[in-house]
A protein has these predicted regions:
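Conserved proline-anchored active-site loop of SAM-dependent methyltransferases
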Residues: 1
């Protein structure tokens, strides 16, 4: 699950505390961008078929907390990056798949 991977990566970078205590958004965003690039490069280089599940984050309300807004924005960027290198992409709502790509 890409959502859990993103959350765990932020956790590995001590991101939640950094956002709450120091507002290190730019530095953390740069570190995450590097992690995202490494993931997408690895996915693009594999010869295996990979199915990735993630959460859609663009349809909801703007979160009140800075940490939640940061997470939503980063997951959105990661979703875009992974969809860009994917051969196909579907959005599934209420069990109904809609092909995006």
């Amino acid at each position: 699950c890409l959502t859990l991977w993103c959350s765990a990566t932020i956790d590995d970078l001590n991101g939640w505390e950094r956002i709450e205590n120091n507002n290190e958004f730019a530095e953390l965003e740069s570190e995450l961008s590097n992690c995202f690039q490494n993931l997408t490069k690895s996915l693009a280089a594999t010869f295996s078929q990979v199915m990735i599940v993630t959460n859609e984050v663009g349809y909801g309300i703007v979160p009140e907390l800075a940490t939640t807004r940061f997470f939503r924005d980063q997951l959105g960027k990661l979703n875009i990056a992974v969809a860009a290198i994917s051969g196909t992409a579907f959005q599934v709502t209420a069990g109904i798949p809609v092909r995006l790509k």
